[in-house]
Amino acid sequence: MGESIPLAAPVPVEQAVLETFFSHLGIFSYDKAKDNVEKEREANKSAGGSWLSLLAALAHLAAAEKVYHSLTYLGQKLGGQSFFSRKDSIRTIYTSLHNELKKVVAGRGAPGGTAPHVEELLPHLSEQLCFFVQARMEIADFYEKMYALSTQKFINTEELVSTLDTILRKYSSRFHHPILSPLESSFQLEVGVLSHLLKAQAQISEWKFLPSLVTLHNAHTKLQSWGQTFEKQRETKKHLFGGQSQKAVQPPHLFLWLMKLKTMLLAKFSFYFHEALSRQTTASEMKALTAKANPDLFGKISSFIRKYDAANVSLIFDNRGSESFQGHGYHHPHSYREAPKGVDQYPAVVSLPSDRPVMHWPNVIMIMTDRASDLNSLEKVVHFYDDKVQSTYFLTRPEPHFTIVVIFESKKSERDSHFISFLNELSLALKNPKVFASLKPGSKG
């Protein structure tokens, strides 16, 4: 007979409780996580020591995480509620939790009813959880900042990406204990998705085809991985007259908002790079694919042209100062192309119903030059009628490098509300500050 294989040492009860708690938290089962540690605390209330203190802190952590992922704390006005209905700000909740965890760290070696090696583990975990709580506060502040930006004319996402990357670097490997791995994974996923989406927004606004395509794909892959967490979970619903059914767990508002931001960016990407994408498929399939976009900007413009007999609607990219500009689609990084000059510095990256009307382009560029200050306000609609060519031009600028122009080969009033409304709606759809406003649950986004 061979030698018997030694059995692994049994996992201490405390460690098993911790592993169960963090695995629940990692799949956003806040209530289960909270219930488990509260039951454990009730069963061991005579024990005292670090274990009991940590269990109390963990119950508060589960509650804080539920509020954090719901985003209900955004835009709270201080003093706007009565004392009894007042909701503590997320910062207050996490600060209080941080103080609780600090006490566990400070109580290292305090007498308690747990084994010595467990008493060593608890302060170590609490120390790492302190960093996690600090990271949460900084990301919560970041969401507050994004929500506040929804009232701005233009959102500089490059600044947001820089702030987010700084937070990620600061807390990278700060809560790395194996027991905390579900927490670390969900943190990395969330911040990774957000960073990719904001980078994609900045890259689309610079008309960078391949970088924005890759970044959007990375965000999509991470969101898919995250979404499977909810798909795998089933919750049982008992019916009034007996029987029960199971359905997938409803994801938290934060996840749904990130999906919404991705959908908006896909619509913008498919509009800005319509020319490059349409080369990869048939016209009918491209039309069917863009119709699924939300909003369907291509369909919106096509309907407007048919309804009001517009000669052309174009999205113009001002590539002056852009050394990397090489035209539609992907270009090898080492391929050489002379920098555009003259009218070629203002290409129509989107032109409907057909190619840009060359005869109108000098007029369009002249208006863009003469009315630059109005267009740079990023909210005004500029009107110009040229009696020589019997044509009317309406222009607006949704973001710094892009201008929308609507051309009619007839005289149109600058007060025509249909045209002004169309340009304002199209411009707003491209800026889409509403998606930042919709961070707050219940807002019209």
Swiss-Prot record:
Domain of life: Eukaryota
Protein name: KICSTOR subunit 2
Gene3D superfamilies: 1.10.3450.30
Compartment list: Lysosome membrane
Family: Belongs to the KICS2 family.
Quaternary structure and partners: Part of the KICSTOR complex composed of KPTN, ITFG2, KICS2 and SZT2. SZT2 probably serves as a link between the other three proteins in the KICSTOR complex and may mediate the direct interaction with the GATOR complex via GATOR1. The KICSTOR complex interacts directly with the GATOR1 complex and most probably indirectly with the GATOR2 complex in an amino acid-independent manner.
Alphabetical list of Pfam families matching this protein: C12orf66_like
InterPro entries the record matches: C12orf66-like_central_sf, KICS_2
Function field: As part of the KICSTOR complex functions in the amino acid-sensing branch of the TORC1 signaling pathway. Recruits, in an amino acid-independent manner, the GATOR1 complex to the lysosomal membranes and allows its interaction with GATOR2 and the RAG GTPases. Functions upstream of the RAG GTPases and is required to negatively regulate mTORC1 signaling in absence of amino acids. In absence of the KICSTOR complex mTORC1 is constitutively localized to the lysosome and activated. The KICSTOR complex is also probably involved in the regulation of mTORC1 by glucose.
Example of a GO cellular component annotation carried by this entry: KICSTOR complex
Positions in coiled-coil regions: none
Keywords, in A-Z order: Lysosome, Membrane
GO BP terms, alphabetized: cellular response to amino acid starvation; cellular response to glucose starvation; negative regulation of TORC1 signaling; protein localization to lysosome
The keyword Kinase is assigned to this record: no
